[in-house]
């Protein structure tokens, strides 16, 4: 039984995009669209989660993800606590479950979890008290669902419906939790074609079973693509010499203006960050007119607001009327 859905099929935890119904994926994006309107106002708060407490529990360092989750919770008027795991009681020998029990005793409503171990978020979701939600902010090589959802949201805003689009994911697919989540989300939302491009040493052996087309040749994989999602090399997760050098990687798989010409004339360039300029992206492409990288960051706030409002607020339907501003 899925830990993510309650018996009525409503989202109670977000651990992965794998297996989520298309209707639910669409509802998240639609709800995010409604929150985007709020973020454009002078007062960027709504009172949906006033009185709720959300704890950011990050066992791995993060800047963009933790900050956007914190902003998203604050925009919903929730109270936010950031736990410094390096100085927490877990560093003094307390078990993870004991720490969770103590935090639950403080009447928290949700944990946003980032962890180096694959499966950590699901483990926590299966052991939290009833009524406490868990949102996966990235676990090992397993999943990063909110990144995938904000990428899908960005694509829909920039390019319209996903059905006719060819989307290419380029780089270190093997070690990327983002790539797996993107594939499940994009195909779940009906994307026309999803391609993965990378050297053989950075492609999972069974990746084709997910329904993607696989390319080792960068130029062939880029041909006619509408969306390019560039991924960084996950050096911290690599074991052994999987690549000769970063300069050779760039010569074969780096996105340059010349390579960009092989794509659709109106193709967009995306990256989940952090960007390694001169490794996966030429600086001129990263800063060029087709790059929507900074818009991804902005969209991440609205998407994470949507996820929080759904797991903590029930049905998560997009408001029929514009959301009213809170007084403060």
UniProtKB/Swiss-Prot annotation:
SUPFAM superfamilies: Aspartate/ornithine carbamoyltransferase. Its EC number is 2.1.3.2. Carbamoyl phosphate binds at residues 64-65, 114, 144, 147, 273-274. Pathway: Pyrimidine metabolism; UMP biosynthesis via de novo pathway; (S)-dihydroorotate from bicarbonate: step 2/3. It catalyses: carbamoyl phosphate + L-aspartate = N-carbamoyl-L-aspartate + phosphate + H(+). One of its GO terms (biological process) is amino acid metabolic process. L-aspartate binds at residues 92, 177, 232. Keywords: Pyrimidine biosynthesis, Transferase. One of its GO terms (molecular function) is amino acid binding. Signal peptide: none annotated. It is an enzyme of class 2 (transferase). GO terms for cellular component: cytosol. It comes from the Bacteria. Catalyzes the condensation of carbamoyl phosphate and aspartate to form carbamoyl aspartate and inorganic phosphate, the committed step in the de novo pyrimidine nucleotide biosynthesis pathway. Heterododecamer (2C3:3R2) of six catalytic PyrB chains organized as two trimers (C3), and six regulatory PyrI chains organized as three dimers (R2). Belongs to the aspartate/ornithine carbamoyltransferase superfamily. ATCase family. This is Aspartate carbamoyltransferase catalytic subunit.
